Amino acid sequence: MELREEAWSPGPLDSEDQQMASHENPVDILIMDDDDVPSWPPTKLSPPQSAPPAGPPPRPRPPAPYICNECGKSFSHWSKLTRHQRTHTGERPNACADCGKTFSQSSHLVQHRRIHTGEKPYACLECGKRFSWSSNLMQHQRIHTGEKPYTCPDCGRSFTQSKSLAKHRRSHSGLKPFVCPRCGRGFSQPKSLARHLRLHPELSGPGVAAKVLAASVRRAKGPEEAVAADGEIAIPVGDGEGIIVVGAPGEGAAAAAAMAGAGAKAAGPRSRRAPAPKPYVCLECGKGFGHGAGLLAHQRAQHGDGLGAAGGEEPAHICVECGEGFVQGAALRRHKKIHAVGAPSVCSSCGQSYYRAGGEEEDDDDEAAGGRCPECRGGEGR
């Protein structure tokens, strides 16, 4: 038998040999017996550790060293305390350059200025309609979503706005807070009182009607607000016959009647001098304006697209005298008679009020007709 010497070469390694060869130090290999092999699935599991909170920890509230002496409320900055104290002092240092209205905060002035500039930065994503205030946009979006968060507790009917619910609830209670100071008749809506005031010539003037409406709206909100707003307002009636006191503290609006024999001098100490006349009054909220354009801008911003707009239509016919808008031209022509002739006339036959079709040149014809309305005069020729 012949023996040969051959060079040894490593053969193919199995999986275990490859694992051992991969370690430089054989000591790193852990060899366990069958008894030491852990069972699967494990019998005991430790609870998972809670993940650390995402983001930075909440910042601590800053100290509030500035305290209001009136109510004890504290603030972190002196400027915030100064702004808060204006609610107690009534200071309004921010004035509008266009209408003179004052505000306690500059941000409120910025919002008010949008009435004059026409700026509408808030747009509806559904229809593209724009608004001057975010609150108006929120109310408008309920038209698309169908949301009606204000529900009547009496009948269950829902509304999109709180003021609509307040108007509706008067139908259940029968409350008529808007009272005519001349005859004591009550109305549930301020616009109904405005139409009724045309029957009283001494109350149909723009300036007088504005005071009556504003005082009636304030009195409907509460006696405290009525007294704090303007107190007593004395309105002359006729030529020295007497006055009507509107907004007298401690009295109901129905008790504010004509004071015969008081004279024109009695109106002096009772009247409170206003900074500027505001003959144009919003029939929805009672707010007064010095110009018709301001009233129209207010109504479009706060109460919709203007007076006379039915079903969301844009009023295309605007009165140049007061800024009131109408959808139809015929309604505008009827409205212009108020500015052309002033107070309405009362028919001597039927007692109904009516407006003459022309100005002073038709007074002779009206007197010749005996002060009768066109319906009564027209019936004579039939």
UniProtKB/Swiss-Prot annotation:
<dbReference type="InterPro" id="IPR013087">
    <property type="entry name" value="Znf_C2H2_type"/>
</dbReference>
<dbReference type="GO" id="GO:0005634">
    <property type="term" value="C:nucleus"/>
</dbReference>
<keyword id="KW-0479">Metal-binding</keyword>
<feature type="zinc finger region" description="C2H2-type 2">
    <location>
        <begin position="94"/>
        <end position="116"/>
    </location>
</feature>
<feature type="cross-link" description="Glycyl lysine isopeptide (Lys-Gly) (interchain with G-Cter in SUMO2)">
    <location>
        <position position="191"/>
    </location>
</feature>
<keyword id="KW-0238">DNA-binding</keyword>
<dbReference type="InterPro" id="IPR050527">
    <property type="entry name" value="Snail/Krueppel_Znf"/>
</dbReference>
<keyword id="KW-0804">Transcription</keyword>
<feature type="modified residue" description="Phosphothreonine">
    <location>
        <position position="117"/>
    </location>
</feature>
<dbReference type="Pfam" id="PF13465">
    <property type="entry name" value="zf-H2C2_2"/>
</dbReference>
<keyword id="KW-0863">Zinc-finger</keyword>
<feature type="zinc finger region" description="C2H2-type 5">
    <location>
        <begin position="178"/>
        <end position="200"/>
    </location>
</feature>
<keyword id="KW-0539">Nucleus</keyword>
<feature type="zinc finger region" description="C2H2-type 3">
    <location>
        <begin position="122"/>
        <end position="144"/>
    </location>
</feature>
<keyword id="KW-0832">Ubl conjugation</keyword>
<feature type="zinc finger region" description="C2H2-type 4">
    <location>
        <begin position="150"/>
        <end position="172"/>
    </location>
</feature>
<comment type="function">
    <text>May be involved in transcriptional regulation.</text>
</comment>
<dbReference type="Pfam" id="PF00096">
    <property type="entry name" value="zf-C2H2"/>
</dbReference>
<feature type="region of interest" description="Disordered">
    <location>
        <begin position="1"/>
        <end position="65"/>
    </location>
</feature>
<keyword id="KW-0805">Transcription regulation</keyword>
<dbReference type="GO" id="GO:0006357">
    <property type="term" value="P:regulation of transcription by RNA polymerase II"/>
</dbReference>
<feature type="modified residue" description="Phosphotyrosine">
    <location>
        <position position="122"/>
    </location>
</feature>
<feature type="region of interest" description="Disordered">
    <location>
        <begin position="357"/>
        <end position="382"/>
    </location>
</feature>
<keyword id="KW-0677">Repeat</keyword>
<dbReference type="GO" id="GO:0008270">
    <property type="term" value="F:zinc ion binding"/>
</dbReference>
<comment type="similarity">
    <text>Belongs to the krueppel C2H2-type zinc-finger protein family.</text>
</comment>
<keyword id="KW-1017">Isopeptide bond</keyword>
<dbReference type="InterPro" id="IPR036236">
    <property type="entry name" value="Znf_C2H2_sf"/>
</dbReference>
<feature type="zinc finger region" description="C2H2-type 7">
    <location>
        <begin position="317"/>
        <end position="339"/>
    </location>
</feature>
<feature type="compositionally biased region" description="Pro residues">
    <location>
        <begin position="39"/>
        <end position="65"/>
    </location>
</feature>
<feature type="modified residue" description="Phosphoserine">
    <location>
        <position position="132"/>
    </location>
</feature>
<dbReference type="GO" id="GO:0000981">
    <property type="term" value="F:DNA-binding transcription factor activity, RNA polymerase II-specific"/>
</dbReference>
<dbReference type="GO" id="GO:0043565">
    <property type="term" value="F:sequence-specific DNA binding"/>
</dbReference>
<dbReference type="GO" id="GO:1990837">
    <property type="term" value="F:sequence-specific double-stranded DNA binding"/>
</dbReference>
<feature type="cross-link" description="Glycyl lysine isopeptide (Lys-Gly) (interchain with G-Cter in SUMO2)">
    <location>
        <position position="211"/>
    </location>
</feature>
<keyword id="KW-0862">Zinc</keyword>
<dbReference type="Pfam" id="PF13912">
    <property type="entry name" value="zf-C2H2_6"/>
</dbReference>
<keyword id="KW-0597">Phosphoprotein</keyword>
<feature type="zinc finger region" description="C2H2-type 1">
    <location>
        <begin position="66"/>
        <end position="88"/>
    </location>
</feature>
<protein>
    <recommendedName>
        <fullName>Zinc finger protein 787</fullName>
    </recommendedName>
</protein>
<feature type="zinc finger region" description="C2H2-type 6">
    <location>
        <begin position="280"/>
        <end position="303"/>
    </location>
</feature>
